[in-house]
């Protein structure tokens, strides 16, 4: 499934899944919610409503620790790939956040680690 998004390359952004070392991109969940498959939507709706229900195994959910100026949290992440034009980087994770208020400047944020995979 492809999900076109408004991406923003932030050279100061760095997020990795600590167990695998995979690069992580950050996605604003409200901006893409209606474009995600139903199973992902249901799980993420529950996550952001503070449900403790486990994710369906087929989603391949990872929990990624995140530290920012807003504090520390765990973000749900799904396997993903990043494509910019003809360049494609697989083996990434897309972590979902639900900022208040949402930032209209971007839907997906990626850092240097993900950008290097596109080369």
Model-derived regions: residue spans:
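Pepsin/retropepsin-fold aspartyl endopeptidases
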Residues: 1-119
